[in-house]
Amino acid sequence: MTCYKHGKAVFKGMGKTVEKYPLVIAEEANIPFLLNIPGTGRRIIGEIYSVDEQLLHFLDDFEGCPNWYQRTPQEIEILEWEGTDDSPDERPAANSIITCFVYSTTCYQPEWLQLPYHKCYDAFGNHGLRYIRHRDII
């Protein structure tokens, strides 16, 4: 378990969206944006966490939810599960489907649809678009 000043999170594993979405890297800071356009783009790979209510409220605020990003339940295919605190009957099998909250946005520039679609985000990925913290731009 990881304890933050804003709540607690437990890494559970890796998953992939059942539905395709466009994941683009945009703006001056090279920010990853998951565009809420189901059926377009790629199946997105990401980490799965269990978070407490305190951290969930912090994340909503951090992501500008619901105005900038929207937190919606999405079907996620389990790629690998590492949740060691789960009882055997709570551990989802590989390739099974669970529902997780995902932050995506309907607020984007039309030209973002012409950007490359990524299947996952890594600030140091081979796309060469390293994330720039806001304070480093100013």
From Swiss-Prot:
Entry annotation: catalytic residues: 63
Q: Which reaction does it catalyse?
A: epsilon-(gamma-L-glutamyl)-L-lysine = 5-oxo-L-proline + L-lysine
The record's listing under Pfam families reads: GGACT
> For this chain's UniProt record, which GO biological process terms are given?
modified amino acid catabolic process
GO molecular function ontology, one term from the record:
gamma-glutamylaminecyclotransferase activity
Q: Report the enzyme's class at the first EC level.
A: lyase
InterPro entries from the xrefs? AIG2-like_dom (IPR009288), GGACT (IPR039126), GGCT-like (IPR013024), GGCT-like_sf (IPR036568)
Q: What is its EC number?
A: 4.3.2.8
**Could you state one GO cellular component term attached to this entry?**
cytosol
For this UniProt record, the keywords arranged alphabetically read as follows: Lyase
The entry's family comment says: Belongs to the gamma-glutamylcyclotransferase family.
Q: According to its UniProt entry, what is the function of this protein?
A: May contribute to degradation of proteins cross-linked by transglutaminases by degrading the cross-link between a lysine and a glutamic acid residue. Catalyzes the formation of 5-oxo-L-proline from L-gamma-glutamyl-L-epsilon-lysine.
Q: What is this protein called?
A: Gamma-glutamylaminecyclotransferase
Source species of the chain:
Xenopus laevis
Q: What gene is behind this protein?
A: ggact
